[in-house]
């Protein structure tokens, strides 16, 4: 970026601050250290430290915990997303608690009013009459449950709000439909009341919110453990900067005076925490709601949810400032018309696009600058009955391209996540197609590394004469695939030693000859 800028303004480009959001937060911390003396911001926790803290917390969970089966990576991601959304453990607990309480209130009311989904499955009913009538009663009940409810968080409505909105829309569409169909009603039921037990149907998010309540406590303990070690994680860099600017008026005014012209690139990738940092730099009354700020972004790209980003952040930006001007960029310099046409067909399927929520509708029909600059593309869309068919077809296509003389280096397979690429790999290998696969690995999730960590923990437990930990670790370690031991024999050995509660030394001869 700086090199490109220097082509326009020369050496003055080195006087301009060009940062990532984390880099900007770090710049503030380093340049205004006197405002951060009470913060533990000298020791950034690396992946190993974070892994150890989370592993310790997870190991201390009860066996009945809903978090017990989650891997460390998913817990790390969940905490990161919460921080990026500016949601503290306390806030998260309140949100989940409110959802659970409202779900219970709804279930009680449905029971009292004898509103039961099973009536929809009775034989001989007039579905055209019964289905709408049932769901209209459900809508009335939802309205009663939600009456006078204040959201636990100002920007997070209870889940039943969205259930109510979806059902209201469904009933309205049914009234206007030329032909009655039960499919939309069944889809609604599965989407919002998809859990079935002996008492009937439950809101689909019921158990999820119970799990979130547990996670909020886990998240809180993680924060406490991190701070007790005098550490902070990557997301804390922005969060602590936000807190300090909010609390220290002098710092806020200094930053607002220094950074009077702000350009935000790829704004669709901005999360709530990053947006709040920008807001603090631009909310001075002297700006009269019109600071010198320019945001460049494409809300259609926000569907990838990069680092907690949401397209609503762009809409918030529009409403935050006075008389915000929208500059519509309709010329594309990178693609031919065929590509843009296909992209448009996909983008039009996105619900709640930015242009539909702005007071002035903007034209999102993108035009190619010059088709002659690119070769004509070959686009094909395929539907498959199974992933096996899909992966087989991709491998065959790549093999045929290579046989036709196309260099393998000119071929790429793109996917939104790593899992489908990993599943595709055996099909390419079967065709003897060499691949270059790049992935940012979490070494602690590697099976071999995880096994070595467990074995190391066992050695320490033996050294410490910790019988409980040995009893817990030994069966798991003996079950590792590379030992190739009979699972039945491992179970027998585990049962024998646990039942006798023998000494540490008795494990070794027993296990060596199992």
Which residues are covered by each model-predicted region?
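Gly/lys/ser-thr-rich phosphate-binding loops in alpha/beta enzymes
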Residues: 1-11, 412, 419-428, 498-505, ...
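Polyanion-engaging groove/track-forming segments
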Residues: 78-84, 88-91, 206, 290, ...
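Accessory C-terminal helicase-associated subdomains
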Residues: 209-213, 466-467, 514
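"flanking P-loop NTPase cores in genome-maintenance ATPases
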Residues: 60-210
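Conserved helicase NTPase motor core
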Residues: 1, 17, 45-50, 101, ...
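A general alpha-helix detector
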Residues: 53-60, 78, 218-222, 240, ...
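Conserved P-loop NTPase-based nucleic-acid remodeling module centered on helicase motor cores
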Residues: 2-101, 109-111, 115, 312-316
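Conserved motor-region signature of P-loop NTPase helicases/translocases
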Residues: 1-3, 91, 95, 250, ...
